[in-house]
Amino acid sequence: FSSKTIPILAILRKNLLADINTRVLYTQDLPSCFDADTIRSVYGYRFELAQLDSADSIPPFDGSTILISHEDEMNAIDLDPNVDFYIGFHSDLGSILLVNEERNKDYVSDIQHVRRRETIAMTPANALDALKLLVDKSLVHTIKTNVQGNKTSVLNSLKEITGTETKPLVASSGLSMQYAIMMGLIDDAQQNHPNKPIRFVVPTNCYGGTNDQARRVAACLDHVEIVDLAVDGDNDMVQSIDKVLDKIALEDAVPLIIAEIPTNPRVEVPELVKLKEVLCKQRITAS
């Protein structure tokens, strides 16, 4: 994976839906991007977290055990029988996930689906570096990346081209960006509208990845549901959003709309001014 956290999240997601306990063990420091409190509160995942002095002796556990280690070299790993998943963090490339034994083979397809729906596996450049490391371990000290410099250049170019001071955000793929936005919106809604249900409004004919991803998020959180938005046939976005927002207002829920405009040619907006009016309209809850 190009990500250090996604392989952990993929296992946590499957175990949440299967009601399986998860133990996350680590021997060094956790990556700064792994915020245990946020993962529990926003994603709804359940797990125990513990640091080990040594990975030589790991006690048994009623559930799945994830062992995290920092490995810049790609060596053969002798997995402890009490470890179900081994995740090796690489400083420049991301992470490598090893699945232990036959008892966990049914996790593989679910983990692969996370790579299709929530993120990417690995960029072509990183994949090439990883293959080189498999052939020659000495290359671990020669991998040079300028990710931060490249990001700065891209962000500056976006501001220059668009003529705005708004902070741009970039991601390795559209779905990974959308996933980050969705979880960020859930976090924001929980902080600013605590204890209120959340409704993601999704066009019924939008791209399969978008629809599937939204439903995968909702499947993990009891207070999040998907509301279908009819936008084709005799329906247009303005009329449909007006009806949907009235319904969500009666539920006193937080509406979040995934629009896909203008990338989806089937989503029609006849009049932008009326769309603005519908989005700005004050609505009344049932109480």
Put a short name on every predicted segment.
Residues T65-S69, D84-Y86, L256-I258, E268-S287:
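Catalytic PLP-binding core of fold-type I/II PLP enzymes
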Residues F1-R199, P203-K243:
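Conserved N-terminal alpha-helix of the aminotransferase class I/II PLP-enzyme fold
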Residues D234, V238-K276:
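Glycine/proline-rich, positively charged
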Residues Q51-S54, V227-V231, V254-P255, L279, ...:
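Short, surface-exposed, polar/charged, turn-prone segments marking secondary-structure boundaries
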Residues L17-D19, K247-D252, E277-T285:
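Secondary-structure boundary elements
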